[in-house]
Design a protein with these regions (language model features):
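Amphipathic, Lys/Arg-enriched alpha-helical "gate/interface" segment within cytosolic domains
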Residues: 1-140
Length: 140
């Protein structure tokens, strides 16, 4: 993970950043329940992940607390196809604090399958532990 690029990037309702622990973070901020993540925004998010990971294997922690809305079918297909072909995302940890978002993530993962392991958490600290454990497993 030596090539891991530090920095942050913001696109619309999403901010991506890295920390010294090697985790790539994403915080989505959307308070509009009728807003859908579209194909263009999903493309920008994927570009941010590629740039900040510097094509090195990293865990992705996605903070969806207090987020509303959903995603378009086109965006969902793009994300699932891209994650299936993205060898540098080793796992996804979702942090949620509402039943509706938890169900949305579970439905997305069931319908748009990827090979990347994922887990849902209520706290950032639990998600970080999961990410670090998955990283350690790969280094063994």
């Amino acid at each position: 993970m030596e090539k891991f690029r530090k920095g942050s990037t913001t696109y619309g309702n999403a901010t991506f950043w890295t920390q010294d622990n090697g985790i790539l973070y994403c915080k989505l901020r959307n308070l509009q329940p009728d807003l859908k993540l579209d194909y263009k925004s999903a493309s920008l998010y994927l570009d941010a992940i590629r740039k900040l990971s510097a094509d090195e294997p990293v865990p992705l922690l996605i903070d969806l607390r207090d987020t509303k809305g959903t995603f378009s079918n086109d965006a969902a297909h793009l994300l699932s196809d891209s994650f299936s072909n993205m060898p540098f995302v080793i796992c996804e940890a979702y942090v949620v604090n509402s039943l509706s978002v938890k169900l949305l993530v579970q439905a997305y993962k069931r319908i748009y399958k990827t090979n990347i392991p994922y887990a849902l958490f209520n706290r950032i600290s639990e998600a970080e532990t999961y990410c670090l454990e998955r990283t350690a497993e790969l280094c063994q």
